[in-house]
Amino acid sequence: AALIGSILGNSVLVLGLALFFGGLKNGTQRFNSEPPKMIVTLMLLASAVLVIPTLAKELHTPAEAHILSLDIVLAVILLILLAANIYFSVKGDPAVAMQAAETGHAEWSMKLTIIVLAGAGIGAAFVSDWFVEALQPAMASLGISEAFAGLVVVAVAGNAIENLIGIQLAWRNQADYAISVIQNSSLQIALGLFPVLVLLSYVLGGAILTFVLSPMLVAVLLL
């Protein structure tokens, strides 16, 4: 639920807020339509892939007996799509590059970038551990269901920083960057985080994470 909530929160709520506040300050905002088209296409493919195991189980097809193998194959397909998207992104888009040149911001060195990412990753690990420990008592005291906590609370809190950055970029009239940050966040969860967690759950044992979702989550995802 938290993964699906993160995808929906970025794609609907945060993108809507960014467009609202960006338009409120700057009026009509224009952006290059090609990168969003690519992201939307990949999201449609990812959604179709995520729905397959659920349909196989709910419709009681012969594939239901091979959900484990199906999950692994679909996870690999999603990771291949992510790799292809990263390759395209690294090549860069001329319109976005032009916008970056107009802003005139200095670029970070590779060493500084790696150090900052490593520090952010370590900090995120500690914060996540604290957040999980604090969430369970809060759910019990406030009467929050697991579905609501996953779809709303964890999804919004887990992506709070990048969500604020996307809205801030739209406020500064950098629409290309804003849309890229927000939409790519959802895409990375669908194509990267979800399949990696599924594969790790099978490798490490214990609780198994599968692509089989509840009918409600499937309906929400398709909408």
Listing of model-derived features with the role each one plays in the protein:
Residues 1, 126-148, 155:
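Membrane-embedded alpha-helical segments and adjacent helix-loop junctions characteristic
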Residues 14-18, 157-167:
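Short helical (or helix-break) motifs at transmembrane helix termini and adjacent helical loops
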Residues 1, 21-37, 140-148, 169-179, ...:
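Juxtamembrane helix-boundary/capping and inter-helix hinge elements in multi-pass membrane proteins
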Residues 116-121, 147-151, 180:
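Short alpha-helical transmembrane interface motifs in multi-pass membrane proteins
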Residues 2-12, 35-43, 151-159, 181-189:
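Transmembrane helix-bundle signature of multi-pass membrane transporters/permeases
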Residues 23, 134-138, 163-167:
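Membrane-spanning helices that line or support transport/gating and their immediate boundary helices
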Residues 11-133, 142, 207-223:
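Alpha-helical transmembrane bundles of multi-pass secondary active transporters
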